[in-house]
Regions:
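Pro/Thr/Ser/Gly-rich low-complexity, intrinsically disordered linker/stalk tracts
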Residues: 333-373, 423-437
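Aromatic-lined carbohydrate-binding/catalytic grooves of carbohydrate-active enzymes
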Residues: 49-85
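C-terminal tail/sorting-segment detector
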Residues: 437-441, 447-450, 454-456, 492-518
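Beta-strand-rich modules
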Residues: 405-425
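Active-site-adjacent "subsite" loops/lids of carbohydrate-active enzymes
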Residues: 6-8, 12-37, 95, 105-162
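Substrate-binding cleft of secreted/luminal carbohydrate-active enzymes
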Residues: 241-242, 246-264, 278-350
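Aromatic-lined carbohydrate-recognition surfaces of secreted/lumenal glycan-active proteins
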Residues: 103-115, 169-170, 188-234, 279-289
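Catalytic domains of carbohydrate-active enzymes, especially glycoside hydrolases
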Residues: 34-63, 162-167
Length: 518
């Protein structure tokens, strides 16, 4: 099963108590550098395993990892709650993720405020006494208090305004399971949805390309043939996550599917069928691979990953340490499973306009450069020309902000696409057009300007039709997979020939040129 070109591959990077990061405190110039170097090492590991989205815990328990006008510093960075570590950890993480072609989403823990006497809970309770409810030793923001929605929206607006985040990721956006419900379930869902809507509106008003996401309970509701065992998003904790996708309040979901077998697969398919064209990347409970946490076998997780890919879903690992510690070889498997780079699916429901293509590509022995006016660029490479930009295996750099790339260019061809903030790609700009014919002779198909000679069909190829497309990827004609194809109506130029079966699966067969003498 070849990796797809578009797929969300995610890690939750937990900062509370330094669970995933940091494992040392920033209290001096040297210790700041050490803390930052540890994060860079983790991000390098993520990138090598094909991860393209990092969810970093930004608001923890009424405390944060950036200088905020609303809430104090968390103690995970400096060792002292309320004390700055001497640098902006959120900005640093964003910059380092972007250098590696990865998105960074600010993970915002919404209602839980931690222990009643801890700094975050204590300060917010002092400022807004009626906003926090005590349940046992812990405090929770009251989902039935309208100020909860506006306060959390202000936090998310602050992050969106001040930082180049790619997403706002809401955690625990639901009623606590220990909450004594005094309203109907329908009213409870309205209360939670009101919080989501307030946050969505403030974020999108500032930057409509910033993705709204959350991590709902892994089972949306009971299914006709499978029971959720009393633990689901919709009925139990008033979390209408599928409705948020339908109504455009969420762009992406990371359901916490920390289950196996018939408690996983039917519910994963339900998320896929109710995605409403948005992005779903179920969270996988890889912490259960640790004997101290559970008794899972790595095959439990790898099978889940394979099925998710079959249904066009992404995957998210909870959490970072269990991933990079390679518990039961899960990191090694992910490197093989994600053997090629992947782009995050475009937000076509927000914007579907393709940006301008890059211009003036120049290739030298140690790299290539191009010109353009869009935020990001993707680079493709292969030994044949034109480079197939539909093939994920040809991706060599993604979400690149720079207009150049250092790479060995010997015996290689390149194509560069521009990409806007919504993930829409331009048509490709191909390199080496003048060198293409002699180098790629084995891929050149015979064409006399009227008839194209089709290559013999391999016995293993399931295809009844062929399609001709331009270098930009536009299909211009189709026909049966026979001995030859009439191309008399095609304009002069270079075209790509692809096979096509009834399921829409396509494979590149070669390329050809239409030339006619006057």
């Amino acid at each position: 099963q070849l990796p797809p070109k578009h797929e969300v591959r995610t890690v939750w990077l937990t900062t509370i108590g330094g669970l995933d990061w940091p494992h040392s405190y920033a209290q001096s110039k040297n210790s700041i550098a050490k803390q930052q170097a540890e994060l860079c090492t983790l991000l390098d590991q993520y990138a090598k395993a094909g991860i393209n989205t990092v969810l970093i815990q930004t608001r923890i328990r009424g405390t944060v990892i950036y200088p905020s006008a609303y809430e104090p510093w968390d103690g995970c960075l400096s060792g002292f709650p309320g004390t700055s570590p001497g640098y902006d950890a959120l900005k640093f993480a964003i910059d380092e993720c972007h250098k590696r072609g990865m998105e960074l989403h600010a993970w915002v823990v919404t209602l839980p405020m931690g222990k009643w006497n801890k700094l975050g809970c204590r300060k917010l309770h002092a400022k807004y006494p009626g906003l926090i409810k005590k349940i046992g030793p812990d405090g929770y923001m009251d989902p039935e208090n309208p100020r909860t929605a506006t306060y959390l929206a202000d936090i998310c607006e602050e992050i969106t305004r001040n930082y180049d985040v790619d997403g706002i990721h809401l955690d625990y956006i639901r009623y606590p399971e220990t909450w004594k419900m005094r309203v109907s379930a329908s009213r409870g869902r309205q209360n939670i949805t009101s919080i989501v809507r307030n946050i969505h509106d403030k974020v999108k008003r500032l930057k409509p390309w910033v993705k709204m996401s959350c991590s709902p309970i892994g089972k949306f509701d009971d299914l006709s043939r499978y029971w959720s065992h009393g633990w689901n998003a919709y009925t139990k904790v008033c979390q209408d996550a599928q409705g948020w996708l339908r109504d455009g309040l969420m762009d992406e979901l990371f359901p916490m599917m920390y289950f196996r077998n018939d408690q996983f697969f039917p519910f994963a398919i339900d998320w896929a069928e109710q995605s409403h064209g948005k992005i779903v990347a179920p969270g996988l409970g890889i912490y259960f691979l640790d004997p101290k946490e559970g008794k899972w076998n790595v095959a439990d997780v790898t099978r889940e990953m394979e099925v998710l890919r079959q249904y066009g879903l992404g995957h998210a690992f909870f959490r970072g340490r269990f991933f990079t510690d390679n518990i039961q070889g899960i990191y090694d498997f992910a490197k093989r499973f994600n053997a090629s780079l992947a782009l995050v699916p475009p937000m076509t429901w927000q914007s579907a306009s393709a940006p301008n293509a890059p211009t003036a590509i120049e290739v030298c022995s140690d790299g290539l450069a191009w010109e353009g006016d869009t935020p990001y660029y993707n680079v493709y490479s292969s030994r044949t020309w034109p480079v197939d930009t539909h093939a994920a295996e040809n991706l060599i750099a993604i979400r690149r902000a720079a207009h150049s790339l250092k790479v060995n260019t010997h015996d290689r061809f390149f194509a560069v696409t521009a990409m806007d903030r919504y993930g829409n790609e331009s048509r490709p700009l191909q390199s080496h057009e003048e060198r293409a014919q002699p180098t790629a002779a084995t891929q050149m198909l015979a064409c006399d300007g009227t008839w194209l000679q089709l290559p013999a069909k391999p016995s293993t190829l399931d295809a009844d039709m062929v399609a001709c497309e331009t270098v930009e990827g536009t299909v211009v004609c189709t026909g049966p997979y026979a001995h030859r194809l009439n191309v008399a109506r095609l304009a002069e130029g270079t075209y790509i020939l692809r096979s096509l079966n009834r399921k829409g699966v396509s494979h590149r067969l070669g390329h050809f040129q239409v030339r006619r003498r006057l």
